[in-house]
From Swiss-Prot:
Intramembrane stretches (start-end): 185-197, 216-230
GO cellular component: endoplasmic reticulum membrane
The protein, known as: Protein C-mannosyl-transferase DPY19L3
Region forming the signal peptide: none
Pathway: Protein modification; protein glycosylation
Tissue expression notes: Widely expressed.
One GO term (biological process): protein glycosylation
Gene symbol of the encoding locus: DPY19L3
Function, as annotated: C-mannosyltransferase that mediates C-mannosylation of tryptophan residues on target proteins. The reaction occurs on the luminal side of the endoplasmic reticulum and involves the transfer of a mannose unit from a dolichylphosphate mannose (Dol-P-Man) donor to an acceptor protein containing a WxxW or WxxC consensus sequence. C-mannosylates RSPO1, a Wnt signaling regulator, preferentially at the first Trp residue in the sequence WxxW. C-mannosylates the netrin receptor UNC5A, preferentially at the third tryptophan of WxxWxxWxxC sequence.
Statement: the UniProt record of this protein carries the keyword Iron-sulfur: no
Sorted UniProt keywords: Endoplasmic reticulum, Glycoprotein, Glycosyltransferase, Membrane, Transferase, Transmembrane, Transmembrane helix
Membrane topology value: Multi-pass membrane protein
Amino acid sequence: MMSIRQRREIRATEVSEDFPAQEENVKLENKLPSGCTSRRLWKILSLTIGGTIALCIGLLTSVYLATLHENDLWFSNIKEVEREISFRTECGLYYSYYKQMLQAPTLVQGFHGLIYDNKTESMKTINLLQRMNIYQEVFLSILYRVLPIQKYLEPVYFYIYTLFGLQAIYVTALYITSWLLSGTWLSGLLAAFWYVTNRIDTTRVEFTIPLRENWALPFFAIQIAAITYFLRPNLQPLSERLTLLAIFISTFLFSLTWQFNQFMMLMQALVLFTLDSLDMLPAVKATWLYGIQITSLLLVCILQFFNSMILGSLLISFNLSVFIARKLQKNLKTGSFLNRLGKLLLHLFMVLCLTLFLNNIIKKILNLKSDEHIFKFLKAKFGLGATRDFDANLYLCEEAFGLLPFNTFGRLSDTLLFYAYIFVLSITVIVAFVVAFHNLSDSTNQQSVGKMEKGTVDLKPETAYNLIHTILFGFLALSTMRMKYLWTSHMCVFASFGLCSPEIWELLLKSVHLYNPKRICIMRYSVPILILLYLCYKFWPGMMDELSELREFYDPDTVELMNWINSNTPRKAVFAGSMQLLAGVKLCTGRTLTNHPHYEDSSLRERTRAVYQIYAKRAPEEVHALLRSFGTDYVILEDSICYERRHRRGCRLRDLLDIANGHMMDGPGENDPDLKPADHPRFCEEIKRNLPPYVAYFTRVFQNKTFHVYKLSRNK
């Protein structure tokens, strides 16, 4: 963080609890060997205590989340089909590939089934390892088959315990990052406590276990911790190389386990670019990190059989553009303030233009359309034009992709996290502006630099990185609620670091003329301890009540549907329906699907729009022809979609389909002038009347309070 450059005399009686220091005072060491020995012993003791607490708090968090999951579902007591149904939507799809690998006679056949899969999308053979990020399921299935644990641990428990184990690593990485920034493990303890007490806003692992982000975010946290250490000045060559290795491995694993990796790392690249441009980060270290990002993505691209979406990512185009712009624009960091500011703006414009140019060229060469729905969504979200695009509106109408709800800040304030975060953020932003202005003013004036060395605050590179990181990811979370988990966890780290930072308190006490070394020590330890006591007092009873509250999984209609499919349909039958439900059909029954929730493919999106015409105003023969074009044998209709009330008018699935088809929406309210009344009634409603035009094409074979299954005729 901010360090006063002017050194003061260090007294032998002062004992530091800091993390391994960046510099050693050789003169003091020669004069006071006994003092230095005691200092080293204290540091070893501090490291031991801090490390032990880090491991314990990580394991306790893991056990806590696993217990919540068990208590909420009574997972150990319910049937296998109920366990599988509890993996909702895309979670069930991912878990099905773990199950598929375990059921394969051999590993080779299991791999072959994933590479040449013809059950995930009917009438198509796709490479699942290319299309999806499921190497983690492959790795776990291999481990389960190889390790001698089959007699003691069911496959589903091996899977979920691995995910909860990763949560232990996640919390430990957050703890270490805060410790590295502040110099005391007390900061890490506070970060971990905040993470747990704000669980609703920091993680959703206990009810979305197989979700890709639950695999990826622990590695992302490790990467941030490693980058924080790497950006420290004066690292030993061996330490630097080992840290680079840790950054590379964690970046690679993060990229391998989540399809949105490229967008998160693009944010990181923007952080590096900002700091490098403002001379707040060594350019050499920024170059290393750019290179690691590109290398990791290219390795993942190879493992995913040259997935074109990775090659066409904005991250690769941006990082290459930064390298090219550096070569084209020399002496970027010299000259007066206005001179440097002009060069910086030109540099920014050049990088932006090169990024867009390279990205468009790559996408045209590869004929890449897989990510176009994301850009359509962003364009509509930020008001750059209204759209009737079904895919974009599907995202816009989901709460998870909306703005961060205001009540989030109320919950974060209850734990004092938000107040502490704003306090620390305000101070560091002011210091960052001062440092950036000084760096741009006159980098060639040695007198100016000398003056700064003697009396001006400075921003450490690792602190500057985490500051810009938290700001950019904060904007991301504010704009898209689903991404809040990337911000709130780092918020815990940044707030706890600031409260335990000696530089923060030194700056604050000096500004109110109360500076005293003892006061700094008192403030940096007493404030976090008081907050920890407050958190224990206020939230411990609630956490104990939460752990004692027992519920049970209950979804009899879905269980009945899955059992009926298993008992009454051929194993090669093809099912159509909603993406979310079909993921469960794939997992519980192994039947072939027409569509599924992994939405990162343009042809799948077109197929899904066609299948969803079952909820639109279409003629029975049109719907039948569309479904049969995908080889559909059975279609599942859900009352919860056909008569949906959860979303407002204009955001119900049937409304999105009506708008995309140019039809007027149901119910009172305005319609766009060019929308016209449909020629046919809504299919999902009319088919239940068993009228001749519908009976000729569809025969009802199953029905309960939630689902209606129809068998398609083949002779039409």
